[in-house]
Amino acid sequence: MSKIQYPMTTAAIFDDVVYPLHFDNAGKVRQEMEGAVNWFCRWCNEEKAAVKARLLVSCWGQYLSHEQVIREAA
């Protein structure tokens, strides 16, 4: 069973800062994740690679990395 189910409202977490996410379908996941990464880059003054490496997304009691979320949505 996929850890991501649609529609789904959740949050991305980076350095104790929370950003809301809403996944309507698999196609929206990449768009929402990129929006979160860009927002964290501006808010925390970090590089994209650093944000992607440390970003976590809450999914049904589990915390998935950026890479895991993108892979789950594929």
Curated annotation (Swiss-Prot):
Tree of life domain: Viruses
Annotated protein name in UniProt: Putative protein ninY
Phylogenetic classification of the source organism: Viruses, Duplodnaviria, Heunggongvirae, Uroviricota, Caudoviricetes
Gene it is expressed from: ninY
